[in-house]
């Protein structure tokens, strides 16, 4: 695996602490950006979904480098993702939990207290270069104390968006858009 600086959709390096929308690499019917949502019996929006609407940017995500405050974000190195935390959640940090109802490992935020009765995995996320198109990437989750790594894909459970899940095929190919240059909607000049 090559090691490269992670670039946004405008070919600018991604920096820790900056806010970015995670959007599909291919625009159109595949949907829009990622956001938090309530799923199943949850009273708090702690599940990460990809919005169905291709003109919806979702919620910006902030990347940090564990143990380092600055520097460039490089492919294949651990990153932590944070999204604006709802009051009801214990943490804004991305995590992986198993939803027993759909029998899938899903991306969410927070820890055990945010996903009662569900298995929560500890591990790290990395950003890896995707095969297509230019400046596109995939997110990967590696379990702690294991050599097991899985791509982050999508699963549609008819919950107002597609859940981000662990998969070994069909990764969600994404681009990062600097949130400071976009307000979260696409407009036409008409």
Curated annotation (Swiss-Prot):
Record site feature (Reactive bond), residues: 68-69
CDD domains cross-referenced by the UniProt entry: beta-trefoil_STI_MP4-like (cd23377)
SUPFAM superfamilies to which the protein is assigned, alphabetical: STI-like
InterPro entries cross-referenced by the UniProt entry: Kunitz_inhibitor_STI-like_sf, Prot_inh_Kunz-lg
Disulfide bonds: 44-88, 142-149
Record GO terms (molecular function): serine-type endopeptidase inhibitor activity
Family: Belongs to the protease inhibitor I3 (leguminous Kunitz-type inhibitor) family.
Descriptive protein name: Subtilisin inhibitor CLSI-II
Subunit structure: Forms active dimers on storage in aqueous solution, possibly through formation of an intermolecular disulfide bond.
One Pfam short name: Kunitz_legume
Keywords carried by this UniProt record: Disulfide bond, Protease inhibitor, Secreted, Serine protease inhibitor
Recorded superkingdom: Eukaryota
Compartment(s): Secreted
Listed GO CC annotations: extracellular region
Modification after translation: The N-terminal Asn is removed in about 50% of both the CLSI-II and CLSI-III chains.
The protein's role, per its UniProt record: Inhibits subtilisin-type microbial serine proteases incuding proteinase K, subtilisin BPN', subtilisin Carlsberg and subtilisin E in a non-stoichiometric manner. Weakly inhibits A.oryzae protease and some metalloproteases including pronase E. Does not inhibit trypsin, chymotrypsin, S.griseus alkaline protease or A.lyticus lysyl endopeptidase. CLSI-II has a wider inhibitory specificity than CLSI-III.
């Amino acid at each position: 695996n090559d090691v490269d600086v992670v670039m946004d959709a405008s070919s600018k390096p991604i920096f820790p602490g900056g806010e970015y929308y995670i959007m599909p690499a291919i625009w159109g019917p595949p949907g829009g950006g990622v956001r938090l949502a309530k799923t199943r019996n949850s009273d708090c929006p702690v599940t990460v979904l990809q919005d169905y609407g291709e003109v919806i940017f979702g919620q910006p995500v902030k990347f940090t480098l564990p143990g380092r405050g600055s520097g460039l974000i490089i492919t294949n190195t651990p990153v932590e993702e944070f999204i604006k935390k709802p009051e009801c959640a214990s943490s804004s940090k991305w995590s992986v939990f198993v939803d027993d109802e759909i029998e899938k490992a899903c991306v969410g935020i927070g820890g055990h207290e945010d996903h009662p009765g569900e298995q929560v995995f500890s591990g790290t996320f990395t950003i890896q270069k995707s095969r297509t198109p230019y400046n596109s990437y995939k997110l990967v989750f590696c379990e702690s104390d294991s050599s097991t790594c899985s791509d982050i894909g999508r699963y549609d459970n008819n919950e107002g968006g597609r859940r981000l899940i662990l998969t070994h095929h069909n990764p969600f190919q994404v681009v990062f858009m600097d949130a400071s240059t976009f307000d979260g909607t696409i407009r036409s000049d008409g």
